[in-house]
């Protein structure tokens, strides 16, 4: 019974950590990252479709992303979707592909991204604390139902806290790593 609670807590905590890392991919660092376009969708025959499912998206160099649609009529649609996404660059349509030229980041932009990374980390920590609360509630219910003794419950609470501390530390390390990556010129 307790192992199920611990395993569930571990699984959910891992998911929170993975979600944080996925969120980090949306932050721009010194070099371009094609994942900055992951949230952009285009109208493809009446259906909103992710950009990477209708075009080839490549980072041609450290400051340029090239988007080549599989169907030429999509060029205008892709161009307007990127403009509407407000990612800080203007799309450049050359008739074959859409190119995005990212200017070097200013110190202020880097610091703003660090703030966003810290906020994402804080959100992940809140998620971990909510997972801890759910695990503690499950232990409390077992104790109340007399399925486990008071001593077993105390050990279980300690184990839940230990798992929480482990994942909180992992989140802090991820944020610190991302922060140094963002500030690197």
UniProtKB/Swiss-Prot annotation:
It is found in: Cytoplasm. One of its GO terms (cellular component) is cytosol. One of its GO terms (molecular function) is ribosomal large subunit binding. Keywords: Cytoplasm, Protein biosynthesis. It holds the Pfam family RRF. GO terms for biological process: cytoplasmic translational termination. Belongs to the RRF family. HAMAP family: RRF. Responsible for the release of ribosomes from messenger RNA at the termination of protein biosynthesis. May increase the efficiency of translation by recycling ribosomes from one round of translation to another. This is Ribosome-recycling factor. The gene is frr.
């Amino acid at each position: 019974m307790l192992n199920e609670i611990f395993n569930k807590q571990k699984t959910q905590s891992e998911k929170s950590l993975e979600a944080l890392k996925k969120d980090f991919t949306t932050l721009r660092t010194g070099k371009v990252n094609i994942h900055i376009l992951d949230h952009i969708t285009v109208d493809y025959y009446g259906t909103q479709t992710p950009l990477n499912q209708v075009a080839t998206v490549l980072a041609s160099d450290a400051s340029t992303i090239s988007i080549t649609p599989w169907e030429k009529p999509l060029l205008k649609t892709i161009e307007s979707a990127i403009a509407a996404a407000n990612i800080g660059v203007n799309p450049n349509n050359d008739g074959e592909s859409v190119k995005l030229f990212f200017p070097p980041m200013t110190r202020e932009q880097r610091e703003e991204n660090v703030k966003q990374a810290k906020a994402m980390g804080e959100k992940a920590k809140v998620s971990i604390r909510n997972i801890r609360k759910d695990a503690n509630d499950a232990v409390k219910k077992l104790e109340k139902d007399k399925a486990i003794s008071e001593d077993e419950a105390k050990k279980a609470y300690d184990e839940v806290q230990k798992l929480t501390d482990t994942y909180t530390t992992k989140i802090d390390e991820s944020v610190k790593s991302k922060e140094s990556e963002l500030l690197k010129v």
